[in-house]
C-alpha cells in the first residue's frame, strides 16, 4: 500500500520528469514480496518525459539479517540482473554511467554508485568526462546517488545534481551527524553555478522507522533562461 500511495502522490504533481536517485532495492532481490505486483504499481507512474533512475549502494546483491546487510566484498560486481529486468518491465529507464538528450532540450545523466558500481563498470566516468561531449548551451542534469564530488561536477558544467543516500540521518541523532559527513546532507545547496538537491527519500534502511526526520517525495520546479 505504501508503494501505491507513493505512486499516487507522484502522479498528483503532474510531473514532466520523474527521477529515482538510487537505493531502489534493499540489497536482496529475494526480499521483494511480490515483484510482479511491484512492477504493476511502478508502471503507474506517469510523466511527460518518462521515469529515469540510477543505482545506489544498496542496489547490490547482499544477504540481509535483522534489517542490516553483510557479505559484500569490496570490488565485487554483484548486481542481480533481475533488478535490471524489473525496472525495464516497470518502464523505468536505468542510466548506468550514461546520459540522454531529452526533447532536444536538456541532458539527463545517471551515475553508478561510486563504491559499488555494479556489473561491467570498473570505474565510473569522471565529472569532466560526463560533460565533455555535451552541448554546454543546453541544461545538464545529473542523478548521482551519493552527494559527493559537488565541486568537480560544478566545474564540469553540470547545472543540477540530484542525490539521495543520506536518508537525512533517518533517526535522531543520526540527522545531526550527517552535517559532519556531507557538504549537503539534505535539502538544497548552491555550489558554484550548480544546484545540488539531496532528498531524504521515500524509504528506509535497517529499522522500519524514522525519528526526527521525514520521508519525502521531492517536487522540483526548474526553469532555465537563455544566457
Where are the regions that the model predicts?
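Soluble catalytic domains of enzymes that build or remodel membrane lipids, polysaccharides, and related
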Residues: 1-227
Amino acid at each position: 500500500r505504501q508503494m501505491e500511495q507513493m505512486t499516487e502522490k507522484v502522479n498528483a504533481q503532474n510531473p514532466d520528469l520523474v527521477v529515482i536517485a538510487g537505493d531502489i532495492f534493499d540489497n536482496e532481490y529475494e526480499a521483494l514480496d511480490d515483484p510482479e505486483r511491484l512492477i504493476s504499481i511502478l508502471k503507474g507512474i506517469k510523466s511527460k518525459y518518462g521515469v529515469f533512475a540510477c543505482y545506489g549502494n544498496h542496489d547490490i546483491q547482499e544477504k540481509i539479517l535483522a534489517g542490516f546487510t553483510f557479505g559484500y566484498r569490496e570490488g565485487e560486481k554483484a548486481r542481480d540482473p533481475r533488478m535490471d529486468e524489473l525496472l525495464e518491465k516497470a518502464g523505468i529507464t536505468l542510466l548506468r554511467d550514461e546520459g540522454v538528450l531529452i526533447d532536444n532540450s536538456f541532458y539527463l545523466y545517471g551515475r553508478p554508485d561510486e563504491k559499488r558500481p555494479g556489473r561491467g563498470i570498473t570505474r565510473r566516468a569522471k565529472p569532466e568526462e560526463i560533460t565533455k561531449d555535451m552541448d554546454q548551451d543546453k541544461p545538464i542534469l545529473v542523478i548521482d546517488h551519493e552527494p559527493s564530488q559537488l565541486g568537480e561536477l560544478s566545474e564540469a558544467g553540470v547545472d543540477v545534481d540530484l542525490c539521495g543516500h543520506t536518508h537525512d540521518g533517518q533517526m535522531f541523532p543520526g540527522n545531526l551527524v550527517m552535517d559532519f559527513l556531507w557538504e549537503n546532507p539534505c535539502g538544497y545547496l548552491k555550489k558554484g553555478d550548480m544546484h545540488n538537491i539531496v532528498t531524504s527519500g521515500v524509504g528506509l534502511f535497517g529499522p522500519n522507522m524514522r525519528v526526527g526526520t521525514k520521508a519525502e517525495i521531492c517536487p522540483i520546479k526548474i526553469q532555465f533562461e537563455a544566457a
